[in-house]
């Protein structure tokens, strides 16, 4: 999309520890390690939004992958792993494919609702939204709420 200069933007999660790293231990068995990821190529845009997750207000901070770095469209990375959040809220963006169902639903809520709120806050007006599988389904709910608000207040 970036190479073709398509008018697109991406939103994804910034996983503090990613999936996991593997290595073969001295005993010959596979060892799993969660190693904190650092991405110096992401820009802190000093923007955040708030999303309610299981009754807790969670601050969602955004970083941006600038289009020129990997010849992509702009991509915004969302994280909850910031000091303003509780330890539980920070863990929402720790691991990709977390086995805890409660965390997985929280991740989808942060990505979907937080993503829509961020894009609108920083000035994106969009006509089309692509949701990858059900992972960002809460985005559809956020858009529906906003549509009902505009219909009620404009017509």
Question: Where in the sequence are the language-model features?
Answer:
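Catalytic cores of carbohydrate-active enzymes across secretory and cytosolic contexts
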Residues: 2-155
